[in-house]
């Protein structure tokens, strides 16, 4: 389970937080030292970090400094997302900070052609496509710019078709479940894996219990866990589990 679960650290204004359904006005701040958290997370193979300021187009040097410090202390692989929309920022994280993979969200939804070029330049192992979607009349519609707005693409499956055979890693978030501790959307992930079996899928949103994680193990490749790590004491339980 330690190899399946990817702990998440969300940074806003230099602080560790969790949002509720992507709402920046509903941020819970966790009074925990980054060093202490990273020490605990070293029990896991992977780590997911989000620069929430970057996700909504804001600069925050505090966040980038924290990410660089985490890289020095975390022993496993790290992926970073939030506002990564150009080659310069990708090279900064991959080459200067030595991050293992970058997560592209808004860019991969708004500009497929440019994203494909990036995948070919850096390799599919280095690029994670993050598609955050919301259920609108039983159709999962991608949202962009830190979940603040919808885009022209009206169906996640139409978007995935464009990357089929090109991209390898997906991070799929059901926004309505994010931060709610209501369980992952197994049905959505099952549909994606059935239609596009070549994608490596990371599930995100709503994961709150060990049972949630076990259910997701049947339909996805990884599960990103954020709020439940802090509030449901999952960290200790998973950390002592079998890989």
Identify the residue ranges that each predicted region occupies.
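Glycine/small-residue-rich loop that forms an oxyanion/phosphate-binding "nest" at active or ligand-binding sites
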Residues: 60-122
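Short catalytic helix/loop segments, enriched in acidic residues and glycine
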Residues: 23-41
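Catalytic cores of alpha/beta
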Residues: 78-101, 187-223
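Glycine-rich phosphate-binding active-site loops on the catalytic face of alpha/beta enzymes
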Residues: 92, 96-114, 176, 205-209, ...
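Structural preference for beta-strand elements that scaffold enzyme active sites
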Residues: 4-8, 46-48, 77-79, 100-103, ...
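Conserved anion-binding
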Residues: 12-26, 99-178
């Amino acid at each position: 389970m330690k190899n399946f679960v990817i702990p998440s650290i969300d940074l806003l204004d230099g602080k560790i937080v969790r949002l509720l359904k992507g709402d920046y006005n509903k941020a819970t701040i966790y009074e925990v030292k980054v060093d202490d958290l990273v020490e605990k997370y070293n029990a896991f193979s992977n780590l997911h970090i989000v620069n929430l300021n970057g996700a909504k187009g804001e600069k925050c040097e505090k966040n980038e400094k924290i990410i660089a410090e985490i890289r020095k202390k975390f022993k496993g692989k790290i992926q970073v997302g939030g506002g990564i929309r150009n080659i310069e920022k990708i090279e900064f994280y991959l080459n200067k900070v030595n991050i293992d993979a970058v997560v592209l969200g808004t860019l991969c939804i708004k500009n497929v052609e440019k994203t494909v070029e990036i995948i070919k330049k850096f390799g599919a192992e280095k690029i994670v496509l993050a598609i955050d979607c919301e259920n609108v009349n039983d159709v999962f519609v991608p949202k962009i710019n830190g979940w603040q707005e919808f885009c022209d693409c009206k169906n996640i499956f139409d978007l995935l078709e464009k990357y089929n055979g090109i991209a390898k890693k997906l991070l799929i978030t059901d926004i309505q479940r994010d931060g709610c501790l209501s369980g992952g959307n197994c049905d959505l992930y099952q549909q994606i894996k059935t239609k596009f079996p070549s994608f490596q899928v990371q599930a995100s949103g709503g994961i709150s219990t060990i049972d949630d994680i076990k259910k997701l193990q049947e339909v996805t490749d990884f599960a990103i866990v954020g709020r439940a790590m802090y509030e449901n004491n999952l960290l200790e339980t998973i950390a002592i589990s079998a890989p």
